[in-house]
Amino acid sequence: MTEYSGIEVYPNTYEKEYCEEIIKHFNVMARNKVTYNQNNLEVNQDNRIVFDWAHTQSQYHYDYNLCDYFYKKLHDTYTEQYMEKYQMLKQSEQHSPKGMSIQKSLPHQGYHAWHAEAADIGSSSRVMNYMLYLNDVEDG
């Protein structure tokens, strides 16, 4: 029997070298404690770095090639695997990922605050959420 939980895992979708490049960019920004947004730099108070990587004309691209590769891989995995399993998504309105944040969580840490994935007008049309884990399983 096929399970339809909506939660899927696609191991090794992104190559190790690509993940290392994202970590390198994260570490540079974390060291400087800055977060880029569309119009300015902001001092970041936690361990989350927001890259406004949405693939649209009006938003800032921190590193175009890094972002473009991320969204191409995400799109390929989504259309070739996820949508094939969840056929109802083929009948939904056109949708695309918007923005990306990177957060470093040490072993036994995580995002434990209650939250909603469609909490405001900016996220109210969200169709799905995705996560890319950059650590090895042994790291926790």
Each predicted region: which residue ranges?
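Fe(II)/2-oxoglutarate oxygenase catalytic core
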Residues: 1-140
